[in-house]
Amino acid sequence: MPRLPRDCSSRIIGSRARQLVHYSFDVNHWEYHEYTGTDHGIDCVIELVENEEWHNKKIEGQIKGTRKPVCLKKGNVISFPIDVKTVNYGLGSNVAFVLFVVDVDNEKVYYLPLQD
């Protein structure tokens, strides 16, 4: 029997994390755009829609998925390792840049606006 490529858990976790971030935004007020292909630090752009009008207000996002987040302070805060280059990239953005960390097993999305 020929050997076939194997699927990897990181692809599954990443795919599920992107899906959970996408569906955490109300479609009546936000348009979600996923970036695929070469990863330069932006996984998605979320654009605000108010009163059925586009206002060019956007959030860029980096999405990280995990099955075992390190929870601090009764589960409201997590610790997650992140590369300094990712933080620097987000800080250099001219629009709001948010780091999304997703607990894919419990379907919980944590977020940190980097410019705050």
Regions found by a protein language model. Name each.
Residues 1-40, 46-116:
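Mixed-charge (Asp/Glu-Lys/Arg
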